[in-house]
């Protein structure tokens, strides 16, 4: 029976154990009867509860029952005393009925108790309150009977409720903890898990129960000695009443079981944590080796262009993003495993290290595959980027070669050739870079089979290899075609350079010939002072003509070369319509002027030779000297020469040009006239010698 069940009855204080003891150390049970009618049933329940509190040892020392009848009637007292034989155990040794101050019929009362003495089994005495000290020490009596023992029924009841609650909770908790702890000690792991799972959490908090027990024990220990004036006053919460040793025993048992329970919880928590780690590890491993690896298996291509490679990179970044979430779980698990390893539980070290190694191997392998794939796609993107740049360079070079250029001069041709060479060199550099990128990509692809998870990647690799080699071969062919076209264009440009050079040199030949003509007309005007000088002038003139002839022939050859080059270049020669007529015109003018110069020099030679013969004194040939015809011939040649000096050179186009200036012609004519005068004088001397002598 628990106090909480009959709490309303206990609050009525129909009976109580004050904690006092008789001289035999037996407990004192007090029944305070009141004026109101006492319910025997409630009193019986109260007595049953109170008598269940003391230990068997206490009960063996017997009870002294004080029935306080001072405020009650005799019939009630009698009924209570008679009821004690059914409620109070046989160890009751004495019942003290405290009589009121009013007179009871002694004979009746004595007769009644004496009559029932044998049947009651205990002694019943009537005593006044002030006479109780004959049987019980004052310190063991409450203040109601003139004693010094302090008793607070409600305080006792509250403490009793606490005690019973603690006892009930601690007993139940001990059973639960024992079940849990015993279940955890079983050898069969399945039974252990089943028992722990079913009863792992106690119905009450062990910490709370322990705290309640300690507070209760502290209260019991403090209330044991609460007397005044240095005297000892026995508390109603004495250990014999509320079983202080029982509280201590319960606390000891609770501490022991709770310590075991905490260890079980720790082991359970560790096992749970280990199982959770193992489960998470397997989740990471299964995903990485399952869906994660499948994602990588499905991504083998490298794309056939920059856009395709970028699309594959974007897809790979999505795959990496999914992997990053699992790698984050890996980092967290690795930290948890490291913490457990540092805890130093030997029994779990092997399993933890195995899990850690398995997790690390899978994660590092998957991370390596992701990095390899990323590097492969980056290499493919760079390869396609170089290929695209090279293709654009080849397109630009091809476009430049396909346009038929018509440069204005050799300088522009040289500039065009330089630009072609630079573009071709840039193409060479780009092709070399493409080969390097392609070879690096091929090397990476060749290593792809090392992490193929058993998948045959021959087909995928062959497609990638064929694509890379195809791109490089295509670029090589395009570059070779451009080189061939550059060679053709270079030859054409060089021919055009030769054409421009020939045209330029031909124009220069015309200029030179014009300068020779100008020099002939302006400076080649002297006819010599005598035959010898004139012959020298004639010889120089012939050499001068040879120079002019060479210049003309050189110009003709250049113009013929331009015709051949134009035919080769399939273009119209600009020299044939301009330079060649100019060359021919100047040459004809030079020829006419040269012939005129030759005629004049030859006439001058004839004039000077004949004149010199006549003027020289040659007695051996008097007949010759006297030939009249010679004088006439000399005179005729002289006149013809003078006349010729006044006649301009008439070119084929009808234009006229004089040799030298009028003053130059006058000087030459004057010299001829002087010579003619000498010849005439000589003629006269030969005709009339006497005139010469007379004059002398």
Curated annotation (Swiss-Prot):
Q: Which InterPro entries match?
A: CRAL-TRIO_dom (IPR001251), Spectrin_SESTD1 (IPR056804)
Any Gene Ontology CC annotation: calcium channel complex
The CRAL-TRIO domain extends over: 1-153
Q: Which SUPFAM superfamilies match?
A: Spectrin repeat
Give the GO biological process terms.
negative regulation of calcium ion transmembrane transport via high voltage-gated calcium channel
Q: Where are the Spectrin repeats?
A: 275-378, 381-494, 500-602
Name the keywords, alphabetized: Repeat
Q: Which Pfam families match?
A: CRAL_TRIO_2 (PF13716), Spectrin_SESTD1 (PF24915)
State the Gene Ontology terms under molecular function. Answer: phosphatidic acid binding; phosphatidylinositol-3,4-bisphosphate binding; phosphatidylinositol-3,5-bisphosphate binding; phosphatidylinositol-3-phosphate binding; phosphatidylinositol-4,5-bisphosphate binding; phosphatidylinositol-4-phosphate binding; phosphatidylinositol-5-phosphate binding
Member of which family?
Belongs to the SOLO family.
> Tell me, what does this protein do in biology?
May act as the primary docking protein directing membrane turnover and assembly of the transient receptor potential channels TRPC4 and TRPC5. Binds phospholipids such as phosphatidylinositol monophosphates, phosphatidylinositol diphosphates (PIP2s) and phosphatidic acid, but not less polar lipids including phosphatidylcholine, phosphatidylserine, and phosphatidylinositol. The binding to PIP2s is calcium dependent. Might be involved in the plasma membrane localization of CTNNB1.
Assembly with partners or alone: Interacts (via the spectrin 1 repeat) with TRPC4 and TRPC5 (via CIRB domain). Interacts with CTNNB1.
Protein name stated in the entry: SEC14 domain and spectrin repeat-containing protein 1
């Amino acid at each position: 029976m628990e106090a909480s069940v009959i709490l309303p009855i206990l609050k009525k204080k129909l009976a109580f154990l004050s904690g006092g003891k008789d001289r035999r150390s037996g407990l004192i049970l007090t029944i305070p009867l009141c004026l109101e009618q006492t319910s025997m049933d409630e009193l019986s329940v109260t007595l049953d509860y109170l008598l269940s509190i003391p230990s068997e040892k206490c009960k063996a020392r017997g009870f002294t029952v004080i029935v306080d009848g001072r405020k009650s009637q005799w019939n009630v007292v009698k009924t209570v005393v008679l009821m004690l034989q059914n409620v109070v155990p046989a160890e009751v040794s004495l019942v003290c009925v405290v009589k009121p101050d009013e007179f009871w019929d002694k004979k009746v009362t004595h007769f009644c108790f004496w009559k029932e003495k044998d049947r009651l089994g205990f002694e019943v005495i009537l005593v006044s309150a002030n006479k109780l000290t004959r049987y019980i020490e004052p310190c063991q009596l409450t203040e109601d009977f003139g004693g010094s023992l302090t008793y607070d029924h409600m305080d006792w009841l509250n403490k009793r409720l606490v005690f019973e609650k603690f006892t009930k909770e601690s007993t139940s908790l001990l059973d639960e903890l024992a079940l849990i702890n015993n279940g955890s000690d079983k050898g069969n792991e399945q039974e252990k898990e089943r028992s722990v799972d079913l009863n792992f959490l106690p119905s009450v908090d062990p910490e709370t129960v322990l705290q309640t027990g300690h507070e209760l024990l502290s209260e019991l220990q403090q209330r044991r000695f609460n007397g005044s004036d240095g005297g000892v006053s026995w508390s109603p919460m004495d250990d014999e009443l509320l079983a202080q040793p029982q509280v201590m025993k319960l606390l000891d048992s609770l501490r022991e079981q709770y310590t075991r329970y905490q260890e079980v919880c720790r082991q359970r928590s560790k096992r749970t944590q280990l199982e959770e780690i193992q489960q998470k590890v397997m989740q990471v491993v299964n995903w990485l080796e399952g869906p994660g690896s499948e994602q990588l298996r499905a991504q083998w291509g490298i794309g056939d262009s920059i856009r395709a490679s970028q699309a594959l990179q974007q897809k790979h970044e999505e795959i990496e993003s999914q992997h990053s979430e699992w790698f984050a779980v890996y980092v967290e698990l690795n930290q948890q495993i490291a913490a457990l390893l540092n805890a130093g539980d030997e029994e779990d070290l092997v399993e933890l290290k195995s899990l850690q190694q398995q997790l690390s191997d899978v994660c590092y392998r998957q991370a390596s595959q992701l990095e390899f794939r990323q590097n492969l796609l980056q290499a493919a993107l760079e390869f396609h980027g170089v290929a695209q740049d090279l293709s654009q360079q080849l397109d630009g070079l091809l476009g430049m070669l396909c346009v038929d250029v018509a440069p204005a001069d050799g300088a522009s041709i040289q500039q065009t050739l330089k630009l072609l060479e630079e573009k071709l060199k840039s193409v060479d550099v780009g092709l070399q870079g493409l080969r390097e990128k392609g070879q690096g990509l091929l090397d990476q692809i060749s290593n792809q089979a090392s992490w193929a998870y058993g998948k045959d990647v021959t087909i995928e690799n062959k497609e990638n290899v064929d694509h890379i080699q195809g791109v490089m071969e295509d670029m090589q062919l395009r570059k070779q075609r451009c080189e061939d076209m550059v060679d053709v264009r270079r030859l054409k440009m060089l021919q055009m350079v030769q054409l421009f050079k020939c045209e330029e040199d031909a124009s220069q030949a015309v200029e030179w010939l014009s300068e020779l003509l100008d020099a002939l007309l302006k400076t080649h005007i002297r006819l010599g002072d005598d035959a010898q000088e004139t012959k020298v002038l004639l010889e120089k003139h012939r050499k001068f003509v040879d120079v002019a002839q060479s210049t003309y022939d050189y110009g003709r050859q250049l113009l013929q070369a331009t015709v051949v080059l134009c035919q080769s270049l399939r273009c119209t020669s600009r020299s044939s319509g301009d330079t060649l007529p100019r060359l021919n015109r100047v040459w004809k003018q030079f020829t006419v002027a040269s012939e005129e110069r030759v005629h004049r020099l030859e006439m001058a030679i004839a004039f000077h030779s004949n004149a010199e013969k006549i003027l020289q004194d040659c007695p051996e040939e008097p007949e010759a000297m006297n030939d009249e015809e010679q004088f006439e011939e000399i005179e005729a040649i002289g006149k013809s020469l003078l006349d010729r000096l006044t006649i301009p050179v008439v070119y084929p186009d009808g234009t006229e040009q004089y040799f030298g200036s009028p003053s130059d012609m006058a000087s030459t004519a004057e010299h001829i006239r002087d010579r003619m005068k000498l010849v005439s004088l000589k003629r006269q001397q030969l005709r009339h010698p006497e005139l010469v002598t007379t004059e002398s």
